[in-house]
Amino acid sequence: MGTGYEIGCNKCSFSRSLRVGVGMFHSSLEAEIESTSKKEQQTIKQIILGKQNLISEGEGYSIFQCSTCYALVNKFHIKIIENNQTLYESKNQCFKCNTEMQLLPCDKDENTIEGIKCPKCKSDDVQVGKNMLWD
């Protein structure tokens, strides 16, 4: 089950809703691959062609943040493993400054998003609240 969060900066007016996790649609590796961009789907399919015993250890819908300009994106994270070796893992480039974005760990039990900063004012005084469960 996925979780929806509302984040709000305590220093400025920034707020945004974000989704984290997976729902019932993502019950197979194939369904997870379909949740990525068309370009990413092509890359993944080429990498896994003919492979067996594939394991998905992705986070599902995740929050990525740029460590340079603090832009946020909410995209599907996929990590595919075969025999304890990572074959593919989602990487996101910042749409503003082209820096590789960092995957921010979310603790659904504690309602925290580790290391999140406000993309507007760069403050780390960001409030995180659960606003829905989705499937």
What is each PLM-predicted segment?
Residues 25, 52-60, 82-88, 105-117, ...:
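Short linker/helix segments within small regulatory modules
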Residues 1, 13-47:
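N-terminal cysteine/histidine-rich coordination modules
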Residues 1-6, 17, 133-135:
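His-enriched metal-coordination microenvironments in redox/metal-binding proteins
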Residues 9-12, 66-69, 94-97, 118-121:
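Short cysteine-rich clusters marking metal-coordination/redox-active sites
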Residues 47-82:
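Acidic, low-complexity intrinsically disordered segments
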Residues 121-131:
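Exposed, interaction-prone assembly regions rather than primary DNA-binding/catalytic cores
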